Amino acid sequence: MTALPPLGAHVSVAGGLTTAFERAEALGCTAIQIFVKNANQWRGKELTGDEAERFRAAHAAGPVGPVLAHASYLINLATADAALREKSRAALAGELARCARLGVGGLVVHPGAHLGAGCDAGIARVAASLDRVLAKAPEVPVRILLENTAGQGSCLGDCLEHLERIRSLVARPERVGVCLDTCHAFAAGYAIHEPSGSEEFWSEALERFGEALAGVHLNDSVRPFGSRRDRHAHIGEGEIGLGAFARILQDPRLAAVPMVVETEPGDEMAGHRRDLEVLRGLVEPKKPKRRKSDRSVRSDRSV
């Protein structure tokens, strides 16, 4: 039987950061992703030493292994707007510092949108921004993980080459990794719904990034192949198909990569539980139901 990779969900921290581990344990997670602050605000409330200590203790005491964080959606490292770029750099630096205090290993961030300036200019700005942020935190043991995108508008990251180019330009590429989202890849035109397309995509990703591939977002897609629209669906309820997820979970090259689902807003826990059950069922053999007659036979034999 194929062993599952570290598998879990993006869990809420409503009620305090440590509640993430309570939700994770209820879902049977062995990996999670969280927000370390409100993702729709530039600044968050101060993280106290006591909060950080309790988070680390809860992590150490439970079944969760890798913990990732997702950076604010407001951050745009690729913009030509100098004021917005500086604000984005400051926000990313702040989240990086929070992750370090909490013991979070990877901080996922979208590369950003060039807003008409062109891909080359945008990629150069992202790399320069990462250099600025990382230079101010030379000893922080947190890797920034660039996430691929669906390719909406002028967003960078719809092709793996963009992420590789950014990493090639930064001064310390070992501190910059990659997190790949299945919905985004499918929407951007990578045929992961087909066996050959899936093999091609993951082989290319591993060739370009190797061990720098440090996270996977397992999301189905509401929109059809190549739509360039980012709309997540529950696993098996979208356009990608269960086969693609089975191939990912059973790929020995990805066995150590933490993978999380990102259910759309709603009944988060119920959605996560269902998605994770579906994913586990693609790898773990289902236990046959015992028939009443079977139980009777066993009972007779025990007399």
Regions from the language model: what does each represent?
Residues 86, 156-164, 186-256, 270-273:
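Gly/Pro-rich active-site loop or hairpin
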Residues 24, 70, 88, 99, ...:
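Conserved, mostly hydrophobic/aromatic
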Residues 77-177:
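Active-site acidic/histidine proton-transfer and metal-coordination neighborhood
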Residues 10-14, 37-39, 71-74, 112-114, ...:
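Active-site beta-loop-alpha junctions enriched in small/polar residues
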Residues 2, 22-29, 47-68, 93-103, ...:
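Acidic (Asp/Glu)-rich catalytic clusters
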Residues 1-71, 75, 79-96, 285-292:
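N-terminal pre-domain/capping segments
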Residues 30-35, 67-69, 176-182, 210-222:
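Non-cysteine beta-strand/loop elements that form the S-adenosyl-L-methionine
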